[in-house]
Amino acid sequence: MPILHPDTIHLGLDVHKDSISAGILNPGQETPDVEKIFHDEESVRRLIGRFPDPRLVRACYEAGPTGYDLARLLVSMGCAVR
């Protein structure tokens, strides 16, 4: 397992047809912030755009028909996806 950068942002995504619930654990936090966004490309880009460097984002998502396109989008933006 690779050693994580101290500024790594952990992002957990619960994907639904019309929405995504995002759990965001920023460096130094013990409890993630949770928010709900629309399940569209613009909303995902806006979410990832809030972070200083998408390469520091480590995302996990719910695999399935609603998650695969999301995973491809996140990878194209530079995020690590599991």
What feature does the model see in each segment?
Residues 1-82:
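Phosphate- and other anionic-substrate recognition elements at nucleic-acid/protein interfaces
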